[in-house]
């Protein structure tokens, strides 16, 4: 599987998460994963909650729709976003150029 996979139902992302960063951002491709930095620390699920909030805003979907499929206790994660309203430019480029 590549870092970004578009399905009939939505988009699946393989993510390498960088917690405690200076800003929330989609950095780009890193070893076949989409590198995303977030400001939240990796403590008591705060990083996962912040990642879900960030992705819901970036893709314009409800927070409850973003599904953390793998990697709850790991920085390598797999997330499914059903029926995104928009696709951020960094993700669109990976879809257009696999």
From Swiss-Prot:
Cross-referenced Gene3D superfamilies: YggU-like (3.30.1200.10)
InterPro entries: DUF167, YggU-like_sf
Cited Pfam families: DUF167
Domain of life: Bacteria
SUPFAM superfamilies: YggU-like
GO cellular component: cytoplasm
Protein family (similarity comment): Belongs to the UPF0235 family.
PANTHER family linked: UPF0235 PROTEIN C15ORF40 (PTHR13420:SF7)
Name of this chain's protein: UPF0235 protein Asuc_1977
Organism: Actinobacillus succinogenes (strain ATCC 55618 / DSM 22257 / CCUG 43843 / 130Z)
């Amino acid at each position: 599987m590549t870092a970004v996979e578009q399905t009939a139902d939505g988009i699946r992302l393989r993510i390498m998460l960088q917690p405690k960063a200076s800003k929330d951002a989609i950095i780009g491709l890193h070893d076949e994963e989409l590198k995303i930095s977030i400001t939240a620390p990796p403590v008591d699920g705060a990083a996962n909650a912040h990642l879900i909030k960030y992705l819901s805003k970036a893709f314009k979907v409800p927070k409850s729709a973003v599904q953390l499929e793998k990697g709850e206790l790991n920085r390598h994660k797999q997330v499914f976003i059903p029926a995104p309203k928009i696709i951020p430019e960094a993700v669109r480029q990976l879809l257009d150029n696999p």
